[in-house]
Structures are given as C-alpha cells and as structure tokens.
C-alpha cells in the first residue's frame, strides 16, 4: 500500500461537518470538536500566533447591539435621569 498520491483518491468519507456555533464546516465528527472555534469548549478558540484571525473575530466586527450603546453612554459619563434645565439668561 502506498501512502501518497494514489491513496488520496480512495478517501471519500467526510471528516468535518458544519459547526453549530461558528457555522463553518470545521466540526470534526470523530473528535467531536470544531477546528475553528473549539466547540464544545466554553471559550472561543483564539491564539496570539494568528493575529489576522483574531482581527476577523474580535469585538467590533459584528453588530455590537448593546456595546455601541454603552460606548456612547461612556463618552457622556453614564448620565441618567432627566436633562438638567437650562438657566434663564438675564437680559439687561
């Protein structure tokens, strides 16, 4: 048996299928682990040696439905309640 080019044509079973968390076809069926996001691990798979991959998946690349509101509130000092009434200017 050879282990090179001729044996690659005989491979016909899928090793990976769709991942439920990241949606990529990186979920290894026998290992029961995603090669992309690390599912079923609680934390997302990310490494410092792949800076470009971190840039693709980091905070700010998606909707940020809640965080963009928090960012705006942070700039204004997390003000709450009614706005302060304007002081009447005395005309002289």
Swiss-Prot record:
Keyword line: Metal-binding, Ribonucleoprotein, Ribosomal protein, RNA-binding, rRNA-binding, Zinc, Zinc-finger
GO molecular function: rRNA binding; structural constituent of ribosome; zinc ion binding
Matches recorded under PANTHER family: 60S RIBOSOMAL PROTEIN L37 (PTHR10768), RIBOSOMAL PROTEIN L37 (PTHR10768:SF0)
Function field: Binds to the 23S rRNA.
HAMAP family linked: Ribosomal_eL37
Family per record: Belongs to the eukaryotic ribosomal protein eL37 family.
Record's protein name: Large ribosomal subunit protein eL37
UniProt organism field: Spodoptera frugiperda (Fall armyworm)
Gene coding for it: RpL37
């Amino acid at each position: 048996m050879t282990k090179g080019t001729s044996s690659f044509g005989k491979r016909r079973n899928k090793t990976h299928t769709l991942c439920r968390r990241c949606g990529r076809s990186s979920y290894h069926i026998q290992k029961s682990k995603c090669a992309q996001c690390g599912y079923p691990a609680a934390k997302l798979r990310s490494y410092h040696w792949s800076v470009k991959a971190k840039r693709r998946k980091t905070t700010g690349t998606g909707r940020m439905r809640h965080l963009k509101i928090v960012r705006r509130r942070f700039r204004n000092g997390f003000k709450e309640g009614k706005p302060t009434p304007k002081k009447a200017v005395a005309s002289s």
